[in-house]
């Protein structure tokens, strides 16, 4: 087995929804980082040879009977350890300190004051704003530890035992609301763990190509190609690794955006000289979706049908052992892990049949969306593909709320095309992270000409984001929204009203279903 990286920071997962952000921040520094279950043994960790270990936050109390724990022997490995929030409390509990329930849960921004010149806060201001999210707190640090930071509600906001390179912070440095959080993590990664920062997208390509070759050998791979950013990058990466051992299957399920099916075939079959098989499965998918309105059921149906289509094609091709998918880190987070609650199932991770005939290859499942775009650029994929709007696996099937019909699909397809065209016309396509239209399952009264109408409403969803974990609604200029609204009402049949979604994530998700 090829050695993948020379230096790595290991993050142990105790259930916080922020956990993936820790790995992301560290990779931004040019240091490879992986998230693993808290159940890893000290011996397993030793074999991984990390430069440092981070114990993540989580929803438990260290005194709960079923709270998440880790192997206490990690403190015997002579590897630097940073505990964040619950991770700090668990460290305290294991090493002889005292943790208690706080008299008042602390959630949101807080001011801390640094005591002395601790390693984690080197060259940082003595007072700073951090993001707190905890119900318990450390009331007595373990023997030999010093208190490095205090706040009004949390007198032990940070602690350390410098000679052992053990550190704890009650707040979340990985969240952007902690104004010097990145600097603190850098001090741990570079100052304490002595990493050099050698990891890059170029390095990632080499690593993943080698992993693909070692996994696949001389066997054949099917790639679920949709033409979106994720599947496109997967296809090009795998094709670069194993060439003609890859066959791309493009399923036209009738749930695609306007002009997308034709564009996919031209780009990949002609432009990249890949073996692409187009499967016309419109009727198959729509028949399965007939009468179904529950969003989770729609996702499961579409996910299952995708796999069954690939099964059928694999039978025709013979000798296919692997299926490649563009699953991202955010897909896995939102679908839930052993330690995190499910928000909604994702097409790439939640709808797979138990009797699937092939093994999965998911080379992007440690990357966020913006990292995938950077990877695509490094692979030489054209900007029009790399910067294409994120598009869910179930396609327009989850942008038609309620039952999916041909008429409703055409409404969403045409309105979405108008939105994308006008965003591009006004030079906003790089300023807005994602934008699309949805069709709620409601009608309203309107007046067009001299006649009363009773037709559908189109919702516009446009958000700004960095990684899809959180987002804010995009401030599209009113005059641009006016043009979009006017065009949709006049050019799309059965629409008499347009609304704009001004909800952030959280509390909403980016997609409506």
From Swiss-Prot:
Domain Glutamine amidotransferase type-1 as annotated: residue spans: 8-198
Alphabetized UniProt keyword annotations: ATP-binding, Glutamine amidotransferase, GMP biosynthesis, Ligase, Nucleotide-binding, Purine biosynthesis
Top EC class, one word: ligase
Active site: 85 (nucleophile), 172, 174
Pfam families in the cross-refs: GATase, GMP_synt_C, NAD_synthase
EC number: 6.3.5.2
Pathway: Purine metabolism; GMP biosynthesis; GMP from XMP (L-Gln route): step 1/1
Cellular component GO terms, alphabetical: cytosol
Domain called GMPS ATP-PPase: residue spans: 199-388
Subunit text: Homodimer.
Function: Catalyzes the synthesis of GMP from XMP.
Protein name: GMP synthase [glutamine-hydrolyzing]
């Amino acid at each position: 087995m090829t050695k993948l990286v020379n230096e790595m920071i290991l993050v142990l997962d105790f259930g916080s929804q922020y956990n993936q952000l820790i790995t992301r921040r560290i990779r931004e520094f040019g240091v490879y980082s992986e998230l693993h279950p808290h159940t890893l043994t000290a011996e397993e960790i030793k074999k991984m040879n990390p430069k440092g270990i981070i114990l993540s936050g989580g929803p438990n109390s260290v005194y709960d009977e079923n709270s998440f724990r880790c192997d206490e022997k990690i403190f015997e490995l002579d590897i630097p350890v940073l505990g964040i929030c619950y991770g700090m409390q668990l460290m305290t509990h294991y090493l002889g300190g005292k943790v208690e329930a706080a008299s008042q849960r602390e959630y949101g921004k807080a001011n801390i004051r640094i005591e002395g010149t601790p390693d984690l806060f080197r060259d940082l201001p003595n007072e700073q704003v951090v993001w707190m999210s905890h119900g318990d707190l450390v009331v007595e640090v373990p023997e030999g530890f010093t208190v490095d930071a205090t706040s009004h509600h949390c007198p032990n906001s940070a602690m350390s035992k410098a000679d052992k390179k053990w550190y704890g912070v009650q707040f979340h440095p990985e969240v952007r609301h902690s104004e010097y959080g990145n600097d603190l993590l850098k001090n741990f990664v570079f100052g304490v763990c002595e990493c050099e920062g050698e990891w890059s997208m170029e390095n990632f390509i080499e690593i993943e190509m080698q992993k693909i070759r070692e996994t696949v050998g001389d066997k054949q791979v099917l790639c679920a190609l949709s033409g979106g950013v994720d599947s496109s990058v997967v296809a090009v990466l795998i094709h670069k690794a194993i060439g003609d051992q890859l066959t791309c299957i493009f399923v036209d399920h009738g749930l695609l955006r306007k002009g997308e099916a034709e564009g996919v075939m031209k780009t990949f079959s002609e432009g990249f000289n890949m073996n692409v098989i187009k499967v016309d499965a419109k009727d198959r998918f729509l028949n399965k979706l007939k009468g179904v309105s529950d969003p989770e059921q729609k996702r499961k149906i579409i996910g299952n049908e995708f796999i069954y289509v690939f099964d059928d094609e694999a039978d025709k091709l013979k000798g296919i052992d692997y299926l490649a998918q563009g699953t991202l880190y955010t897909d896995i987070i939102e679908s839930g892990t052993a330690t995190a609650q499910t928000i909604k199932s994702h097409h790439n991770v939640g709808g797979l049949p138990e009797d699937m005939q092939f093994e999965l290859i998911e080379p992007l499942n440690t990357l966020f969306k913006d990292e995938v775009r950077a990877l695509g650029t490094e692979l030489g994929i054209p900007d029009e593909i790399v910067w294409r709007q994120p598009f869910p696996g179930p396609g327009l099937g989850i942008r038609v709320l309620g039952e999916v019909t041909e008429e409703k699909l055409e409404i969403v397809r045409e309105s979405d095309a108008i939105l994308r065209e006008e965003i591009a016309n006004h030079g906003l396509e790089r300023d807005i992270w994602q934008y699309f239209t949805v069709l709620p399952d409601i009608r309203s009264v309107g007046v067009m000409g001299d006649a009363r109408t009773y037709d559908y409403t189109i919702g516009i969803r446009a958000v700004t984001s960095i990684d899809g974990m959180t987002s804010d609604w995009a401030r599209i200029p009113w005059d641009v929204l006016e043009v979009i609204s006017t065009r949709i009402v006049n050019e799309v049949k059965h629409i008499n009203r347009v609304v704009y979604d001004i909800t952030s994530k959280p509390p909403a998700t980016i997609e409506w279903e």
